[in-house]
């Protein structure tokens, strides 16, 4: 077998071989470091995405729980208002029935008084009729005069003259009592109507205030939910853009590997960039649980 001859004059020097070996070693080391950095960055992105998904699920669950609690509180307040309105209506109904019963009893009492007065008046009139003929027996001249000139008519005229002012007074008193009673009833009805109107206005004002609070709270919840969704979308967009930028920077760093100093500086920059991404906390980790809506107890005043 023929030996292959080696031209010693064409062999490179020891320094050149060492320099080429150092360049190759640096290139291999830089490639390994870049691969490790890319793998670490991808693993960090995967972990961050999982954490974001978990935070979104937790936030959605908490929001649903808050919505259920708010709806339950609104329904409870509505039921309380309905119950109070029914109680107030029942009390007003009982009061009206009681007042109607009082008016009926007063009317019956007035009728009894009028009947007693009429009976008393009839009895007094009968007594006067019985007493008047006895007094005439002692006056023969007057009796003969009355019998000859229509004394019965004159006696009836005198009795009418005596009874007329008394009847007029009784009728006037009865009319005054009736008017006073009517005025009292009208005043009571006016007071009841004014109280009912004031109560209805207060109930309407409270209901309007409750509706305004519920509407304002719903708007705030919608606004906060929209802000969270927008922040989540912006964060996802930034997270999706970072691997692309890193993949574009890889060939450029490989293309500029002239010497050891020029290769080590981009690696340090990329390492600091990766540390910055891993040190940034997730936006949704700072998610604060919304406060519970205040319990509606203002209606119970």
From Swiss-Prot:
GO terms for molecular function: ubiquitin protein ligase binding. Keywords: Coiled coil, Phosphoprotein. Residues 57-131 form a coiled coil. It holds the Pfam family CCDC50_N. One of its GO terms (cellular component) is cytoplasm. Phosphorylated on tyrosine residues. InterPro entries: CCDC50, CCDC50_N. Residues 123-175, 214-301 are annotated as: Disordered. Residues 123-142, 161-175, 214-262 have a biased composition (Basic and acidic residues). Involved in EGFR signaling. This is Coiled-coil domain-containing protein 50. The lineage of its organism: Eukaryota, Metazoa, Chordata, Craniata, Vertebrata.
